[in-house]
């Protein structure tokens, strides 16, 4: 008897699965995936980033990975600090997860206009998109739609360290963006000949782990095969964490040398 192989989960399937207990996120995620404007913006953002500028992935795959990172990070952080919308008494943890999902998924769509100030262009482009998606999520609550939209726009505006995130959710979106730093993302520009400290250091990042912390609420481990990965950690991830004043006290950050790598460093180095 031939054993049938289990179908391989796609990245999209994995992201959808993490929202199985949150109906708000399920609705929003399906709306995002089936929205022609959203998908075209992601496609064209990637075209700007990779084809025209020689940058790493800023399209659909990046959006999915950042959404997954953000949701996982928020889950662990909520054990030590409540999301701002919960602290302020205007929403629930499910609402906070929705803010993080939409902020993470849409944060780079302004790249279709320009890399410079893309956070501002994203806010301009996605405001009407958010309006129609949130009408589906909260069909009978206009006030809630407007309130949640404001949270999402703040998170997107602050994701690139140009502005300080004043909510937990906004800080999570920025950090989740930086967590997509593994060599898989850097491989395309690297193979196209865009070799610089950014792409070379990213090629040294094997894996990123988000887990329950020992001394702080969350522990982030960046697994490296080469010491050059330290640049990626300090210039991108550490800056994003330090830019989120409400979260830095809850995150411990470690650079960890992979077992097969040359031991220029000790097995792990605490960064934060």
What do the predicted segments below correspond to?
Residues 93, 141-149:
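Membrane-interface starts of transmembrane alpha-helices
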Residues 40-48, 98-103, 146-147, 152, ...:
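Short amphipathic alpha-helical segments, especially helix-boundary/capping motifs
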Residues 1-33, 54-57, 68-94, 106, ...:
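Divalent metal-dependent phosphate-bond-processing catalytic cores, especially two-metal-ion Mg2+/Mn2+ enzymes
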Residues 27-50:
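Short alpha-helical hairpin
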Residues 131-144, 163:
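Inter-helical turn/loop segments and adjacent helix faces that build the functional surface
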Residues 45-58, 103-110:
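Glycine-/proline-rich flexible loop or hinge segments
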Residues 66, 90-126, 151-159:
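His-Asp-centered metal-binding catalytic motifs of divalent-metal-dependent phosphohydrolases/nucleases
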């Amino acid at each position: 008897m031939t054993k049938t192989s289990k179908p391989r989960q796609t990245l999209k399937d994995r992201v959808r699965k993490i929202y199985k207990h949150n109906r708000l996120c399920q609705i929003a995620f399906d709306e995002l995936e089936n929205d022609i404007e959203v998908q075209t913006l992601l496609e064209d953002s990637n075209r700007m980033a990779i084809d025209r500028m020689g940058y790493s992935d800023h399209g659909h795959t990046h959006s999915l990975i950042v959404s997954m990172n953000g949701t996982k990070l928020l889950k662990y952080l909520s054990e030590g600090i409540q999301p701002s919308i919960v602290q302020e008494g205007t929403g629930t943890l499910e609402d906070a997860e929705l803010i993080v999902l939409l902020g993470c998924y849409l944060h780079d769509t302004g790249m279709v206009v320009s890399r410079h100030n893309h956070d501002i262009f994203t806010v301009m482009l996605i405001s009407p998109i958010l309006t129609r998606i949130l009408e589906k999520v909260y069909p009978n609550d206009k006030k809630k739609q407007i309130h949640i939209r404001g949270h999402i726009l703040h998170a997107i505006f602050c994701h690139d360290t140009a502005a300080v995130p004043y909510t937990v959710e906004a800080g999570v979106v920025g950090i989740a963006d930086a967590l997509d730093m593994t060599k898989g993302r850097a491989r395309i520009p690297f193979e196209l000949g865009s070799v610089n400290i950014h792409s070379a250091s990213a090629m040294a990042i094997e894996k990123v782990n988000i887990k329950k912390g020992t001394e702080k609420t969350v522990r982030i481990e960046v697994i490296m095969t080469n010491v050059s990965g330290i640049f990626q950690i300090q210039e991108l991830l550490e800056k994003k964490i330090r830019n989120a004043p409400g979260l830095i006290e809850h995150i411990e950050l470690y650079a960890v040398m992979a077992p097969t790598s040359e031991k220029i460093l000790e097995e792990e180095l605490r960064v934060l």
